[in-house]
Amino acid sequence: MKISIIGTGYVGLVSGVCFSEFGFNVTCVDKDKNKIERLKLGEVPIYEPGLEEILKKNTESNRLSFTSD
């Protein structure tokens, strides 16, 4: 299943990362290009325990991607 998340604020980012951890293919979309570039580098702009590690793991396995398009 493919899931799109609109917005990478606290709720959108955590939801998208968690869905990808469950095995879904997730694309997170945000209009803030700087935030998207940081997320692509594995930099998490919010504090949530363990989120950065899960994000990196699922980005590397191609289940999680970020775009501003």
Segments and roles (model prediction):
Residues M1-D69:
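Structural/interface elements that position substrates and couple domains in central-metabolism enzymes
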